[in-house]
């Protein structure tokens, strides 16, 4: 971050999880670690405001990766998450996407 501040530009993009917004039983350590990074991102965004360094937060829902025991083709693909990252990175310095939530259509536990 100090190098980006010296240059007057840069991007910090943290990939979080929708568990920061709504969690489920059995994943307390995972939820807590993502929530800590979420809080850090929000404070860092305020601290770096006006320096030219963007702090972006992506909150993907379920993603079908090898991390999961069973395949979940109804979840987001890694490529769909990458597309969301590219969307965030393509935003201008004047108007950028601070936070983006992307969920698979099957997820309904956020209501």
Give names to the regions the model predicted.
Residues 2-8:
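A short helix-coil junction within the Rossmann-fold of NAD(P)-dependent oxidoreductases
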Residues 54-64:
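Conserved SDR Rossmann-fold cofactor-binding beta-strand/turn motif
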Residues 57-58, 72-110:
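C-terminal helical subdomain
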Residues 2, 46-47:
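Alpha-helical segment proximal to the catalytic Tyr-Lys
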Residues 33:
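Active-site helix of classical SDR
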Residues 24-28, 74:
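Active-site loop immediately N-terminal to the catalytic Tyr-X3-Lys motif
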Residues 17:
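Residue(s) in the substrate-gating loop at a strand-loop-helix junction
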Residues 20-22:
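Conserved catalytic-site region of short-chain dehydrogenase/reductase
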